[in-house]
Amino acid sequence: QQRFPQRYVQLVIVADHRMNTKYNGDSDKIRQWVHQIVNTINEIYRPLNIQFTLVGLEIWSNQDLITVTSVSHDTLASFGNWRETDLLRRQRHDNAQLLTAIDFDGDTVGLAYVGGMCQLKHSTGVIQDHSAINLLVALTMAHELGHNLGMNHDGNQCHCGANSCVMAAMLSDQPSKLFSDCSKKDYQTFLTVNNPQCILNKP
C-alpha cells in the first residue's frame, strides 16, 4: 500500500444550458446533484490523498457560452479554449469540468485530456449527465479526472480487487469506486515526472 502525498484540486463545474433545461431551471436541484457528485469523487480519491474542493458552480441558464455539440472532441476543445480565455481570468481554480445533458456520439459519456492537470487548456473534461443514478455520473467524472491526473485506461493486467475499476475503458454495469494498481502507478509517475504545481496549495 503506497502512500501518496496530499494534493488539493480546486474544481469548477459548469452545467450547460441543456442541463438547465433538463432540471427545469431549478438551480438548487442542479447544485444538489453536483454536490453529491463531488462528495463521491472525494470518497473515490481518498486512497490517493487527493482532496477536491468545489470552488465554483456555473450554470448556463440563459445560453451556452461555447458551442456544445454531440462531437465530444469538439466540445472538449471549445471548453478548454473557453477556460483559458474566459473562466481563468475571473475565477481561481485548478481544473474545470463541463457537465452537459447532450448525448455524445457513440458510447462516449465523457472525455478529458490525459495528463492535463494544471495546464491552461487541458485541465478540463466534459461529462455527459448520462444517468439518473448519481453514482454513475460521479464515476464518469472521477474517470475523466483520472485522465487529467495522468491515468490511462486499464488493460487486462490491471487489478483493483473488483470486477471493474474506475479507469476501465467502458463503464461496467457492476462498477466499483476502486483504482487499479495501474492507475496508481500512472498517477505516481505523473506526480514524479510532471510535478503539477497548482494542486500543491491547500484551498
From Swiss-Prot:
PROSITE patterns: ADAM_MEPRO (PS50215), ZINC_PROTEASE (PS00142). The active site is at E144. Its EC number is 3.4.24.72. One of its GO terms (molecular function) is metalloendopeptidase activity. Keywords: Disulfide bond, Fibrinolytic toxin, Hemostasis impairing toxin, Hydrolase, Metal-binding, Metalloprotease, Pharmaceutical, Protease, Pyrrolidone carboxylic acid, Secreted, Toxin, Zinc. SUPFAM superfamilies: Metalloproteases ('zincins'), catalytic domain (SSF55486). CDD domains: ZnMc_adamalysin_II_like (cd04269). Expressed by the venom gland. It comes from the Eukaryota. One of its GO terms (cellular component) is extracellular region. Belongs to the venom metalloproteinase (M12B) family. P-I subfamily. Snake venom zinc metalloprotease that exhibits direct fibrinolytic activity. Monomer. This is Snake venom metalloproteinase fibrolase. It comes from Agkistrodon contortrix contortrix (Southern copperhead).
